[in-house]
């Protein structure tokens, strides 16, 4: 509830150097995929991440014959009630797919990640499971023909050891979508009953800390 309040009600901005680095790498990948740049056009960690992305791309090509890029930064917007039970027919779920691949047996929804570690892999996979369902509904593609893939391209140690690795993490057949749907239904419940949201928020530890600091 605290995250919902900060991002959707109080509209707190969020900036950090990791986000800046990730955005720069994403923009560069877009240019490279569309033939407007090469990894060697960049420097430092951005170049290293781009070189890792090319290695990961080649790895996917070796595992999925006929692999080619369909689109990048692909907007996917579908009615909310097409992916979950909802009494709000006007609500739309929006998302953006980093890269969509097509191969001889189906599609791959890829997500470039510049995280220094894999500890948030389950969160990323949950997000991709949502995009998978959304793309399936949008383009009428059976879900069993869509694979999801988190592509880590800047894996590092907490203490700088010089490591700068990559990993292709293919989604499992068992989808984490039900976990996301449970969270979504809770938020929809708050929309229907705002008092329940306030009760949950006031009981939340982060809000209590914030409230105590505000009294100082």
Per-segment meaning from a language model:
Residues 7-11, 31-39, 194-197, 201-208:
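Short loop/turn hinge sites at secondary-structure boundaries
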Residues 1-35:
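Charged, glycine-rich intrinsically disordered N-terminal tails and low-complexity linkers that flank
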Residues 125-137:
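An active-site-proximal "capping" alpha-helix that borders the catalytic cofactor pocket
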Residues 28-115, 119, 137-147, 158:
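Catalytic cores of nuclease domains that cleave nucleic-acid phosphodiester backbones
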Residues 10-11, 15, 83-91, 165-171:
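Short, polar loop/linker segments at the starts of domains and inter-domain junctions
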Residues 17-21, 117-125:
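Active-site metal-coordination segments of metallo-dependent hydrolases
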Residues 81, 135-216:
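Metal-dependent nuclease catalytic regions and adjoining charged, substrate-binding loops involved
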């Amino acid at each position: 509830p605290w995250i919902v309040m900060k991002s959707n009600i109080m509209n707190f901005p969020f900036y950090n150097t990791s986000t800046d680095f990730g955005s720069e790498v994403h923009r560069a990948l877009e240019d490279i995929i569309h033939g407007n740049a090469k990894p060697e056009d960049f420097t430092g960690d951005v170049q290293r991440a781009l070189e890792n992305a090319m290695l990961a791309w080649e790895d996917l090509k070796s595992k999925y014959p006929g692999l080619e890029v369909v689109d990048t930064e692909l907007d996917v917007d579908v009615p909310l009630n097409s992916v979950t039970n909802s009494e709000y027919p006007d609500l739309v779920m929006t998302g953006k797919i980093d890269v969509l691949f097509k191969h001889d047996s189906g599609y791959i929804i890829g997500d470039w990640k510049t995280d220094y570690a894999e500890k948030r892999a389950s969160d990323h996979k949950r997000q991709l499971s949502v995009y998978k369902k959304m793309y399936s509904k949008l383009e009428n593609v059976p879900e069993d023909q869509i694979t999801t893939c988190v592509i880590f391209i800047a894996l590092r140690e907490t203490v700088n050891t010089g490591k700068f690795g990559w990993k292709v993490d293919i989604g499992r057949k068992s989808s984490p979508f039900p976990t996301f749907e449970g969270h979504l239904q809770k938020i929809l419940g708050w929309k229907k009953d705002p008092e329940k949201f306030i009760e949950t928020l006031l009981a939340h530890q982060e809000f209590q800390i914030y409230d105590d600091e505000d009294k100082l």
